[in-house]
């Protein structure tokens, strides 16, 4: 915990179709039931301005650097207007996606992209990283079947299995690089409730 924060910052990460949003919502509802001050938000988005940027990011084909800067601009607004104030008030903040998604979705398209994204984040938002990140580990073949069954149509949903595998192995690499922060929850064969119970054990 750094001196910018009084609360706790929890993020959920992984590819498409893995249940991040479901788990974020379940944890939010659980903490509410415990009378814990908590907010639930998401990226890209979370504020009026950032949600408008999201529409461009998920539907338009941007140049790789433009896409990265769009994501970072949205995050800066989100952090300044919502996440940091909530943490300073002592809330737990649960965020569906954060910096690790930017690394895997935008950084891989750029030379030295992983370090570039983390360094840019540190420049814009020094010392502010999640306290704990849950990587929901679902095999790409399972994830793409889930996405196809729900008929989603943003540009990331409709990319093929090679894209899903690239994203998956990127998150695996990050979980190995930052094992103290990123907790891997193997979820391919588990129900949402079983995944939720595993997550609670890390709190």
From Swiss-Prot:
Q: Which GO terms describe its biological process?
A: dTDP biosynthetic process; dTTP biosynthetic process; dUDP biosynthetic process
Q: Do you know which InterPro entries this protein is assigned to?
A: P-loop_NTPase (IPR027417), Thymidylate_kin-like_dom (IPR039430), Thymidylate_kin_CS (IPR018095), Thymidylate_kinase (IPR018094)
GO molecular function annotations of the record: ATP binding; dTMP kinase activity
Q: What is its EC number?
A: 2.7.4.9
| Positions with a binding annotation for ATP | 14-21
Question: What is one cellular component GO term in this UniProt entry?
Answer: cytosol
Which of UniProt's keywords are assigned here? ATP-binding, Kinase, Nucleotide biosynthesis, Nucleotide-binding, Transferase
- Report the leader peptide range: none
Which chemical reaction does it catalyze? dTMP + ATP = dTDP + ADP
According to its UniProt entry, the function of this protein is described as: Phosphorylation of dTMP to form dTDP in both de novo and salvage pathways of dTTP synthesis.
Family statement drawn from the similarity comment of this UniProt entry: Belongs to the thymidylate kinase family.
Which HAMAP family would you find in this protein's record? Thymidylate_kinase
**What is the protein's given name?**
Thymidylate kinase
């Amino acid at each position: 915990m750094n001196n910018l924060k009084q609360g706790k910052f929890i993020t959920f990460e992984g590819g498409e179709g893995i249940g991040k949003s479901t788990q974020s919502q379940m944890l939010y509802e659980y903490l509410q039931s415990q009378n814990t001050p908590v907010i639930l938000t998401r990226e890209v988005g979370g504020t009026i301005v950032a949600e408008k940027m999201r529409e461009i990011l998920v539907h338009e084909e941007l140049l790789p650097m433009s896409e990265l800067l769009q994501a970072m601009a949205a995050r800066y607004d989100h952090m300044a207007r919502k996440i940091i104030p909530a943490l300073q008030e002592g809330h737990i903040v649960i965020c569906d996606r954060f910096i690790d998604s930017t690394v895997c979705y935008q950084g891989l398209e750029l030379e030295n992209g992983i370090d570039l994204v983390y360094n840019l984040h540190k420049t814009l938002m020094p010392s502010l990283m999640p306290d704990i990140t849950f990587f929901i580990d679902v095999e790409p073949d399972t994830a793409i079947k889930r996405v196809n069954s729900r008929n989603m149509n943003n540009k990331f949903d409709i990319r093929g299995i090679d894209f899903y595998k690239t994203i998956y192995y990127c998150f695996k690499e990050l979980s190995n690089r930052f094992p103290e922060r990123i907790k891997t929850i193997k979820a391919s064969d588990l129900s949402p409730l079983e995944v939720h119970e595993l997550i609670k054990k890390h709190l």
